[in-house]
Amino acid sequence: MGKIVGAFAASHSPGVTGWPERAEPRKREAIEGAFAEARRRIDALEPDAIIAISVEHFTNFNFGNLPAFAIATADSYLGPVTPEMSNFLRVEQHQYPGNGKLGRHIYEFAISNEFDPSLVEGGLDFDENFCVPFKHLDPESKYPLVPIIVNGVNPPWPTAKRSYEFGEMLRRAVEAQDAVERVVVVGTGGLSHWVGLPEAGQVNEEFDRDFITRIESGDPEQLKSYSPKEIDAAGNGAHEVRTWIAAAGAIGAPFEVLAYEPVPEWLTGTAVAAATPDLKL
């Protein structure tokens, strides 16, 4: 039987890799140190695959086709999507390995368990959503990925409750197969930030710290109770926290936030977190 052996979550601001030097040295060191610790823990868990949950910045989807959830089933993924984005993010363009069989299993399991995600069979190109965090978490791209997209960019969004339950479904899907034994989940996005708006560069530290308290509590209801209006107060980009909420549902355990820093130079409240099943309360 497969098992989710760990879950991680991290911000994916382009500034983390594209212009890290603009942040205050103390804040940069804290975030990069947290990424290094998360990478160490992932390697120690020896995963056979990583379920990577993020949002999609219109690299593949658009306003005319914007699913609440989407599951990709390719055996490789291009990222960053263009040479220009590669230069912007300071991430070398390359192919990330995928586990298409596990992705297909999760999709079919979801359909049989009251979820109706979109199926992406033809590949899914990456932008900062996966390229930024995985430059730190898996710089050699040695772990096969199952990319999953949660709509966190434009309403109507899936509810926080539905996002958490989607994560719980992922756990059951992994446990319902035995081809891949050890699976890690990584959610990326958030925390507070505004994209393409006059408020860009602001950070809602109050929201961020409240979110951290909730995700460290291990109490599902504290995460599932978020309303879109509450999240709106932290910026249109804050809706990406649904990826963290889904990761929390997948692991069913409290997270340890390894670092949090409000970094206006990166346009984001930036955090890295980790959880393992043995941390259950």
Named regions from a protein language model:
Residues M1-D48, F63-E165, A176, P198-L281:
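Flexible, D/E/H-enriched segments
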Residues S13, V55-N60:
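Short active-site-proximal "capping" loops at secondary-structure junctions
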Residues D48-S54, I148, E181-G189:
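Beta-strand elements within well-structured catalytic alpha/beta cores of enzymes
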Residues F58-N62, S192-G196:
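Short catalytic/ligand-binding loop motif for oxyanion handling, primarily in non-cytosolic enzymes
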Residues G152, G187-G189, V195:
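Generic secondary-structure microfeatures
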Residues A160-G167, R171, A179-V184:
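Active-site regions of metal-assisted phosphoester/phosphodiester hydrolases
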Residues G167, G187-G189, G269:
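Glycine-centered flexibility sites
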